[in-house]
Amino acid sequence: MRLHDSYRWYLHLFYYKFLKISRFFTNNLFGRKEHKFLFILTPPYCGSTLLNQILSTSNNLSCNNHLGVREGQLLPEVKDIMFYNKGWHNEVNYPWQMIKKVWMKYWDQRKEVLMDKTNTNIMRVSEINKVFDNTYFLSMVRNPYAQVEGIMRRNGADAEYAAKFALKCLRYQKKNNEVEKNILLISYEDLCDNTKTSIKKIKNFIPSIGKIKVDIEFSAHNFKTKGKMKIQNLNKEKIEKIAKKDLKLINAIFIKEKYLLEYFGYTIIE
């Protein structure tokens, strides 16, 4: 069922409409003139929703979408343009001026840091820089085996497709890390296992973000519970769910670009 046809979608539309009315007054009366734009660059099923929720505990930051997986591309005015329009295809060009105008209506412009999380933006950094000033890119990667498990389980994809897609994402992240100047690369593993160190890196990267809370429970989607839970590394359990026959096929694909895994500190799992 398409979200456009669901009861929940209409509830979301009501929320978005109310939010924009509220933002219209606060932004026009009290909004700042200058902002820092923070873009989370993270492939799907790599912890981006958790990272978004963690950063959103800052009182000096505004996220453009607080519903669901919290992606800016899912806001109603841009959903058909971004989410349903072959977002992972290179030949698709987005009307970024229009997208920015829409996002500005959802951001709380009283905040200094305005944040977006849209997974496909890992392949559109140069386009973003042409439209947004004062940009900061927070890039995060995750063990590709854990990502593959998520793609297979959540999307119903086979092991071959999932493995090739995971490598595609790592290629974009490698390029972003080497080309973009104002970027910070962290890993899902460090975010979960060395949380305070990761948060310190983020605060040093963009000091305006201010205080961030981590010792609370978050509702980011995971396969263990539909409720909230504290920050926890779920990689081991996810990877153990991969069938042996699928692991063999995944390894046959990963071994061809072993250097790419090693670039981010990952290894082939036998």
Please give the residue ranges for each predicted region.
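PAPS-dependent sulfotransferases, especially Golgi type II membrane carbohydrate sulfotransferases
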Residues: M1-F37, I206-E270
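PAPS-dependent sulfotransferase catalytic core
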Residues: M1-K100
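Glycine-rich helix-loop-beta junction characteristic of Rossmann-like nucleotide cofactor-binding loops
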Residues: G31, M104-D108
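A structural signal for well-ordered alpha-helical scaffolds and beta->alpha junctions
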Residues: F37, S48, V92, W96, ...
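Short, well-ordered beta-strand elements within core beta-sheets of diverse protein domains
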Residues: F39-L41, E189-L191, A243
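A short, structured active-site edge motif that brings together acidic residues
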Residues: H66-Q73, M140-Y145, D215-E217
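PAPS-dependent sulfotransferase catalytic domain
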Residues: P76, D80, Q109-I212, I231
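Generic structural signal for well-ordered alpha-helical scaffold segments
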Residues: W103-M104, K174
